[in-house]
């Protein structure tokens, strides 16, 4: 693990990304379509149906997606490079990308793409055609993300200069273009990458991510993932799979969004429409809370071992968001000390509440006091402590609750869960 960490940090230091994105850039909420489609690729009608779903989440619950990324098969596929001028692409998208782009733009969403890093062919003409195709996505469609994957094939060393030049042209039109390096052995072209795939590992539950111990649900292996090297946010953890094994997905998403809080967070993929109707408010709530606190989540510290495994506190000197987890069969009590230990500077009073697994207003405490919380077996927790009253949100004292709807200009809906 230490060898892997040192290797990653060396790469990050030697090849700082030449984009407008830094370690302190705000996160982007992303969905990518892997498992909704696989290497066969998606279609225009399928994509528009998916975008309609996210439009509904936005209108109903205020959930805002930043990036909708096409996964494998839109243009490139496994071991093949394609073209938007091919008959294969035209059969799937008879109107090109115009309708999809306009639908996404109407909802404040930008598009992204899975593909391979090469595809330049062996002639100047083929190289220019490949370059123009990808640059045109940025020029014409305000492209947000390229995920280049070794599954499609490597980047030939003699083509690295072409690649660097192409990405430079792309960023003239999309300065904040995110380039994900998925297991590519890049050399000179590494300077173009925004993130790397943490541990080279994907997160499809029970396929790429699985339990290594007896547990009551299938996501314990995912909950047990550690912390990225030095809490570097320009890392990609492949997000949270919403397709199979849907129990306790929210615990994993809380850790993805608030514990690691990477550049792409919250990040989901698969088929979120398979969630039950009662779960959509929770999905939106996690996205909405992350957006509300996004400016605070760029800075984090790892907490002492007394807080449990991989506990992290994020925020500034007035407000902290703390993520805890329990990977055992017994409830674990944790004392959260409201002082510099969690990153709070001295103040008079601190307001505390839970956001997950339930919402609960815990009360107002003096600086330096401790708040004892109980983390349930094989669950995560999101705890909030703040001396900044301007960040206070709605809630109900004396009972656990969940926010169903909190959309500007619409009635607020709260579900009361029972008195504490």
Where are the model-predicted features located?
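Conserved structural scaffold segments of CAZyme catalytic domains across common CAZy folds
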Residues: 1-118, 128, 273-304, 314-319, ...
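C-terminal beta-strand-rich structural cap/linker in extracellular carbohydrate-active enzymes
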Residues: 362-413, 417-419
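Short intrinsically disordered coil segments
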Residues: 9-10, 47, 338-339, 398-403
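Generic "edge-of-domain/loop-turn" microfeature
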Residues: 36-38, 75, 120, 329, ...
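Active-site-proximal substrate-binding groove within the catalytic cores of carbohydrate-active enzymes
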Residues: 165-361, 372-385
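Well-ordered alpha-helical segments embedded in enzymatic catalytic cores
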Residues: 49-53, 133, 253
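Aromatic- and carboxylate-enriched substrate-binding clefts and catalytic-loop regions
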Residues: 64-252
């Amino acid at each position: 693990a230490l060898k892997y960490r040192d290797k990653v940090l060396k790469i990050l230091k030697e090849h700082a990304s030449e984009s407008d994105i830094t370690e302190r850039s705000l996160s982007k909420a992303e969905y990518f379509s892997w498992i909704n489609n696989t290497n066969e690729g998606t279609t225009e009608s399928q994509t528009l149906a998916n975008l309609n779903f996210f439009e509904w989440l936005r209108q109903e619950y205020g959930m805002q997606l930043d990036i909708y990324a096409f996964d494998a098969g839109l243009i490139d596929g496994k071991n093949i490079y394609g073209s938007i001028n091919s008959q294969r692409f035209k059969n799937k998208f008879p109107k090109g990308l115009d309708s999809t782009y306009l639908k996404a733009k109407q909802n404040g969403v930008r598009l992204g793409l899975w593909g391979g890093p090469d595809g330049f062919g062996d002639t100047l003409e083929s190289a220019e055609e490949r370059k123009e195709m990808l640059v045109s996505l940025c020029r014409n469609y305000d492209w947000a993300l390229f995920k280049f994957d070794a599954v499609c094939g490597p980047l030939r060393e003699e083509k690295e200069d072409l690649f660097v030049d192409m990405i430079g042209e792309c960023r003239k039109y999309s300065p904040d273009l995110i380039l994900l390096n998925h297991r590519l052995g890049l050399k000179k072209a590494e300077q173009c990458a925004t993130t790397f795939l943490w541990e080279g590992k994907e997160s499809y539950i029970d396929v790429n991510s699985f339990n290594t111990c007896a547990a009551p649900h299938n996501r314990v292996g995912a909950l047990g993932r550690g912390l990225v090297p030095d809490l570097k946010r320009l890392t990609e953890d492949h997000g949270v799979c919403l397709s199979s094994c849907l129990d306790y997905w929210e615990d994993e998403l809380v850790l993805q969004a608030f514990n690691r809080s990477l550049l792409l967070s919250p990040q989901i993929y698969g088929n979120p429409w398979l969630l039950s109707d009662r779960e959509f408010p929770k999905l939106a709530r996690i996205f909405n809370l992350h957006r509300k606190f996004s400016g605070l989540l760029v800075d984090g510290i790892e907490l002492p071992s007394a807080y449990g495994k991989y506990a992290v506190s994020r925020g500034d000197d007035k407000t902290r968001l703390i993520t805890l987890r329990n990977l055992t069969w017994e409830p674990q009590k944790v004392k959260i000390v409201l002082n510099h230990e969690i990153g709070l500077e001295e103040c008079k009073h601190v307001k505390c509440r839970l956001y997950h697994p339930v919402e609960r207003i815990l009360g107002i405490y003096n600086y330096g006091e401790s708040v004892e919380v109980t983390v349930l077996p094989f669950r995560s927790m999101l705890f909030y402590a703040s001396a900044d009253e301007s960040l206070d949100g709605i809630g109900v004292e004396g009972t656990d609750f969940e926010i169903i709807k909190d959309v500007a200009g619409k009635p607020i809906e709260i579900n009361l869960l029972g008195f504490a």
